[in-house]
Regions:
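The feature captures the beta-strand-to-loop junction immediately N-terminal to the Walker
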Residues: 41-43
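Helix-to-loop junction immediately C-terminal to a conserved catalytic motif
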Residues: 56
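ABC ATPase NBD Q-loop/coupling interface
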Residues: 65-88
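Q-loop/switch helix immediately C-terminal to the Walker
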Residues: 107-118
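Conserved ABC ATPase "signature" region
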Residues: 125-143
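Conserved ABC ATPase signature
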Residues: 148-152, 156
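ABC ATPase C-loop
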Residues: 165-166
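Catalytic Walker B motif of ABC-type/P-loop ATPase nucleotide-binding domains
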Residues: 173-176
Length: 240
């Protein structure tokens, strides 16, 4: 079953004070089956993050379709979907992890993870138990659980970001350089979590500059330079 299909995706940005338009991505095309992991590779500035943000609808694309096979709405074009539909999907089906933590002020680490579960309809007790499991798993110091994240280091913020997204066990998870500022032990934890989510059926699309991290994880690779997708067989990409 195809979980995500991107057809002819295009996105440009206008720099108004220079009266200039920059094309970020053009005619992007790929598909991901349920439970697969697609890795997107390419040099900095090639538009990798733009693709993920377009899928999550942080950016509204200028052209093409992004067809997602949702549990709630069936097949839906994320470009044409209403704001209400997008908010529902973000809360219940689609997760996003970036290098940066952007959260509500005066909300503790514990509350942020619990709220991610509560908005899905989980009970307070279930949210409490699963939150503590997630924070422990990603080795967040227990002394930080009731602290505000603006005091955290970059690595701590990133681990919290990952915990918030993965605790929900989303149907589709978008990963934008989620291991950028992590040490090797934390990277292993993230890899183990990704493998666990895959086993549970989560579909993933991710960007990693750490090629070694991606090895053995990805089922497919999309190359921004060639604008082509390949299937990974025994660690080596082959054209699909």
């Amino acid at each position: 079953m195809t979980m995500l299909e991107v057809n002819g995706l295009g996105k440009a940005f206008t720099i108004h004070h220079l009266n200039k338009t920059i094309l970020a991505v053009d005619e992007i095309q790929f598909s991901v089956h349920a439970g697969e992991f697609l890795g997107i590779i390419g040099k900095s500035g090639s538009g990798k993050s733009t693709i993920l943000k377009s899928i999550y609808r942080t950016y509204l694309s200028d052209a093409g379709q992004i067809i997602y096979d949702s549990k709630q709405f069936g097949k839906i074009d994320l470009i044409q979907a209403s704001e209400r539909e997008i908010i529902f999907l973000r809360k219940n089906e689609i997760g996003y992890v970036s290098q940066f933590l952007n959260v509500m002020p005066r909300t503790t680490c514990r509350e942020l993870v619990q709220n991610a579960l509560l908005e899905m309809g989980e009970t307070k007790e279930t949210a409490r138990i699963e939150t503590e499991k997630a924070l422990s798993y990603f080795e967040m110091d227990e002394g930080l659980w009731d602290s505000y994240p603006n005091t955290f280091s970059g690595g701590e913020k990133l681990r919290l970001n990952i915990a918030m997204a993965t605790v929900k066990k989303p149907r589709l998870l978008l990963l934008d350089e989620p291991t950028a500022s992590l040490d090797q032990q934390s990277k292993r934890k993230v890899r183990e979590m990704i493998e666990k989510l895959k086993q549970q059926g989560t579909t993933l699309v991710g960007i990693f500059h750490d090629i070694e991290f991606m090895e053995g994880l990805c089922d497919k690779v999309f190359d921004m330079k060639s604008n082509e997708m390949s299937v990974v067989l025994e660690g080596v990409p082959h054209e699909s």
